[in-house]
Swiss-Prot record:
It comes from the Bacteria. ATP binds at G9, T10, S11, L12, D13, G14, V15, D16. This is Anhydro-N-acetylmuramic acid kinase. It is an enzyme of class 2 (transferase). Belongs to the anhydro-N-acetylmuramic acid kinase family. Pfam families: AnmK. The keyword Nucleotide-binding applies. It catalyses: 1,6-anhydro-N-acetyl-beta-muramate + ATP + H2O = N-acetyl-D-muramate 6-phosphate + ADP + H(+). Keywords: ATP-binding, Carbohydrate metabolism, Kinase, Nucleotide-binding, Transferase. Catalyzes the specific phosphorylation of 1,6-anhydro-N-acetylmuramic acid (anhMurNAc) with the simultaneous cleavage of the 1,6-anhydro ring, generating MurNAc-6-P. Is required for the utilization of anhMurNAc either imported from the medium or derived from its own cell wall murein, and thus plays a role in cell wall recycling. The keyword Nucleotide-binding applies. Pathway: Amino-sugar metabolism; 1,6-anhydro-N-acetylmuramate degradation; Cell wall biogenesis; peptidoglycan recycling.
Length: 355
């Protein structure tokens, strides 16, 4: 089936859209992909409803209609008729994730999107897992396993979006997955506050600074790091502690220290793997930050490479994953497992909407 995936990540950079030919078990063909950035007003609107606050209903409608325009423009640019696309996997945008309270909230109106684009839509991928007692995240490991078929294992696939998450894959295909801690969110928010740009471009700010090692050690005392995987965390969980620890730092030293926070959390996560990995493959925006990649390489014992080293598109991977998960959902296949979200049993998920 030709499936389309849409992802709006916690980094708030934009909408990733990708096409994938898949049966929900294997990947037959990668299709085109692109990212459409958010404007400042859209980013501010989304930030304003984080935590479920503010005018959620209006923001959700605007957010959904923006996705619809992204899809129409993307298909037109590729010369693809919407009638040839079997399903669209619509992640939405996470504004609240509190699995301990059995609550997770991804805004995005699946019925409205289906009506606007004329393609069946699957959305709300996380709620069933959370309702069953799982973490509702990460969701991408089953797609990682499909991609990694044929690669030497054990290996780790690290996604550095707003939050960091990792999938450990053994040579027999068994999985362990969890959120490592902060990804780019701390650094992005620091860069925005100190430079007016929502990202530390090429890690230049961090490269000019010095890491406060005492702050890194103190950061790792956050209670999240005492929890055993599978586990997941909200984008903003670490902000209060992080800001306290870098208070008074220069823009450069703060960026260097926040980069070190993320890398140290990943290094700590590696101790939870059943067996050491032979390599780390990094996807998400963090892989484009040379300072982040250097910090990871220093802290990890196996080689660290971007996913492009094995021919994958790191900018498209999460959107592709939601195309893959949408096909699995339509077929009633499992999306999550005890080893990936901590749910008591494998779970399917997603809500289906027809145009």
């Amino acid at each position: 089936m030709l499936a389309l995936g849409l992802m709006s990540g916690t980094s708030l950079d934009g909408v990733d859209v990708a096409l994938l030919e898949t049966d929900g078990e294997t990947v037959a063909r990668f299709g085109p992909a692109t990212t459409v950035p958010y404007g400042d007003e859209q980013r501010i609107a989304l930030m304003g409803v984080l935590g479920g606050k503010g005018p959620v209903e209006q923001v959700e409608r605007d957010f959904t209609l923006f996705h619809a325009q992204v899809v129409r423009d993307f298909l037109a640019a590729q010369g693809i008729d919407a009638a040839t696309v079997g399903v669209a996997g619509f992640h939405g945008h996470t504004i609240l994730h509190a699995p301990a309270e059995r609550r997770t909230w991804q805004i995005g109106d699946g019925a409205l999107l289906a009506s606007e684009i004329g393609i069946p839509v699957v959305n709300d991928f996380r709620s069933a897992d959370v309702a069953a007692g799982g973490q509702g995240a990460p969701l991408v490991p089953v797609y990682h396993r499909a991609l990694a078929a044929g690669l030497e294992a054990p290996l780790a696939i690290l996604n550095l979006g707003g939050v960091g998450n990792v999938t450990w894959i053994s040579d027999d295909g068994s999985l362990l997955a969890f959120d490592t801690g902060p990804g780019n969110a701390l650094l992005d928010d620091w860069a925005l506050a100190h430079t007016g740009r929502p990202v530390d471009v090429d890690g230049r700010l961090a490269a000019a600074g010095k890491v406060r090692r005492d702050a890194v050690e103190a950061f790792l005392h956050h209670t999240y790091f005492d929890c055993q995987p599978p586990k997941s965390v909200d984008r903003d969980e670490f902000h209060a502690l992080a800001w306290e620890l870098v208070k008074g730092c220069s823009a450069e030293d703060g960026a260097a220290t926040l980069t070190a926070f993320t890398a140290a959390a990943v290094a700590l996560a590696a101790y939870s793997f059943p067996r050491p990995v032979k390599r780390w493959l990094v996807t998400g925006g963090g892989r484009r930050n040379p300072e982040m990649m250097t910090a990871l390489s220093r802290g990890l014992s196996a080689p660290v490479e971007p996913v492009e080293a094995v021919g994958w598109n790191g900018d498209a991977l999460e959107a592709q994953a939601f195309a893959f998960l949408a096909v699995r959902s339509l077929a009633g296949k499992m999306l999550t497992y005890p080893e990936t979200t901590g749910a008591p049993a494998p779970q399917t998920g997603g809500r289906h909407h027809v145009p």
